[in-house]
Amino acid sequence: MHSQQRPNPQMNRHPYGTPGSAPQMRRPGGFAGQPPQMHGPRMVAPPAAPLPKKKKYADKCIHPKIRELEPDAENYMALLASEQKLDSTLSRKKLDIQEALKRPSKVKKRLRIYISHTFIEEKQPEKDTDEASLPMWELRVEGRLLDEQPPAPAIPGQRPVPKRKFSSFFKSLVIELDKEMYGPDQHLVEWHRTPQTNETDGFQVKRAGDRPVKCRILLLLDNHPAKFKLHPRLAKVLGIATETRPKIIEALWQYIKTHGLQDPQERDIINCDTFLSQCFGVNRMRFMEVPNKLHQLLQQTDPLEFNHIIQRPKEGQEQVSTCYDIDVEMEDPVKQFMHTFVHSPGLANDIQTLDQKCYDIIEQINELKTRRDFYARFYTEPAEFIKSWVMSQNSDLKTMNELSGDLEAERFAESYVRPETEEGVQRYMFQKVNQKRHELEQSLGVRSN
């Protein structure tokens, strides 16, 4: 007989499977719930490390049998149900936010432009070796947002979002000076945006001179998406002068629907009225022709124009400054917070860490429940439990040693091949033959000699 082993409290599975679940596969080497036992010197190669199993919602749930033993477990299940509803709501909100981020959302801000100039007086040389400096003036074009909001909090690990600089609002800047005073080569100062442009908070222009100078400043706004100026006739028909291309097409479609210009028979044909005919030069056109014909009626928007006179300030006044307020369109600052909320990994990592703690605790609880069931069955039916345990050990031993047959019967097989056993079998068979012979003779009335 194999020696009976005491149950190891460090087991991982119940011998009969978890209550309420399907029977589990037993590992070779011991009764289910016991660590593998080595029978003989045979060594088994360690199995390859399994891939980490993806956790599911069911892995967080407490088994119903455990809830019967611990009433407070119902409170945990209620919290788990609330968490599932909250996760579902957050997932829907994130999808809504992601869709909102794809749509352009602009808000109008007030940009204040400061145009100022200063004069630098002529400097006489103090020494014979010094050079005299001519009188000069300096023109500055600067600006800032009046109602600028604080930037959205940066994603952890990234730099904070900087404030938007003045030059980022414009596509180009042209300062036109008096051509007669500065000649054809010096009367224009131009700046145009390029992909390599470094943003700045203002522009400075220096020129020699101390006489009053008239200058014209042209600023072209950098709109995203780009805006276009409509032809005067089309602008009068649609009621808009400057707008983006999608907005212009939308306004044109509304005009067509309102006035019933879509052909009732051929739905892809537009029957132009008098006003549209004057704009497009045709009486009928297809919808696919609208973008090309509309493109011919769109022009680049006009730049902002400011006239400024550079002249010496009055006595006691060092700098002359003029302010202009214009409306600019910017990305909705709420989108920055939305982007931070959707793409911030900090909260997701914290939630994942807490979820992993929950998985570990639930796994420990299930292991403790398995141990409890192990000892409870041993306490309730010790004989039946030991019998099942020995049978399980026997089955595991056969699987481990790759054996077949009944090991318990094979242990007593040697007694059947001993000489005394063979002699006993022959005596038994001889006795049985004589007994049958005697019974046959009696039935036939034959008297034996």
Swiss-Prot record:
Residues 223-300 form the SWIB/MDM2 domain. Residues 1-11 have a biased composition (Polar residues). It comes from the Eukaryota. The keyword Chloroplast does not apply. One of its GO terms (cellular component) is SWI/SNF complex. Its main location: nucleus. Pfam families: SWIB. Disruption phenotype: Some knockouts exhibit maternal-effect embryonic or larval lethality. Germ lines are smaller. RNAi-mediated knockdown reduces brood size. Simultaneous knockouts of ham-3 do not survive beyond the L2 larval stage. Simultaneous RNAi-mediated knockdown of ham-3 at the L1 larval stage causes sterility, while at the L3 larval stage, causes embryonic lethality for the progeny. The sterile animals resulting from simultaneous RNAi-mediated knockdown of ham-3 at the L1 larval stage develop smaller germ lines. Keywords: Chromatin regulator, Chromosome, Nucleus, Transcription, Transcription regulation. GO terms for biological process: chromatin remodeling; positive regulation of double-strand break repair; regulation of G1/S transition of mitotic cell cycle; regulation of mitotic metaphase/anaphase transition; regulation of nucleotide-excision repair; regulation of transcription by RNA polymerase II. InterPro entries: SWIB_domain, SWIB_MDM2_dom_sf, SWIB_MDM2_domain. Gene3D superfamilies: SWIB/MDM2 domain. SMART domains: SWIB (SM00151). Component of the multiprotein chromatin-remodeling complexes SWI/SNF: SWI/SNF-A (BAF), SWI/SNF-B (PBAF) and related complexes. The canonical complex contains a catalytic subunit swsn-4, core subunits swsn-1 and swsn-5, and accessory subunits swsn-3, swsn-6, phf-10, dpff-1, swsn-9 and either ham-3/swsn-2.1 or swsn-2.2. Involved in transcriptional activation and repression of select genes by chromatin remodeling (alteration of DNA-nucleosome topology). Component of SWI/SNF chromatin remodeling complexes that carry out key enzymatic activities, changing chromatin structure by altering DNA-histone contacts within a nucleosome in an ATP-dependent manner. Probably regulates vulva development through the let-60/Ras pathway. Involved in nuclear reassembly after mitosis and recruitment of nuclear envelope protein, mel-28, to the nuclear periphery in the early embryo and in the adult germline. This is SWI/SNF chromatin-remodeling accessory subunit 2. It comes from Caenorhabditis elegans. The gene is swsn-2.2.
